[in-house]
Swiss-Prot record:
The modification Phosphoserine is found at S64, S82, S93. The M2 protein from most influenza A strains is inhibited by amantadine and rimantadine, resulting in viral uncoating incapacity. Emergence of amantadine-resistant variants is usually rapid. It is found in: Virion membrane; Host apical cell membrane. GO terms for cellular component: host cell plasma membrane; membrane; virion membrane. It comes from Influenza A virus (strain A/Tokyo/3/1967 H2N2). This is Matrix protein 2.
Length: 97
């Protein structure tokens, strides 16, 4: 089977490609993009559990503290905790009867 932009037709006793502009840069770019899309789609379907598990856990980790002094890390933790403590008063308890 040929590329998506080519049409195979019987010419005399052979199968040949009847393409006028197969060297057109737009046709070549579209073919390359189509092939890459197909490859990425196949890889996504094969490894989707690994890929999405990586993104899910990667997003839950929070900001990186690499290279940050311990005192600044502790200060950041205190700020985060105080923000959580301050928000506790905004919750409303609703009791259903």
């Amino acid at each position: 089977m040929s590329l998506l932009t080519e049409v195979e037709t019987p010419i005399r006793n052979e199968w040949g490609c009847r393409c006028n502009d197969s060297s057109d840069p737009l046709v070549v770019a579209a073919s390359i993009i189509g092939i890459l899309h197909l490859i990425l789609w196949i890889l996504d379907r094969l490894f989707f559990k690994c890929i999405y598990r990586f993104f899910e856990h990667g997003l839950k980790r929070g900001p990186s503290t690499e290279g940050v002094p311990e005192s600044m890390r502790e200060e950041y933790r205190k700020e985060q905790q105080s923000a959580v403590d301050a928000d506790d008063g905004h919750f409303v308890s609703i009791e259903l009867e």
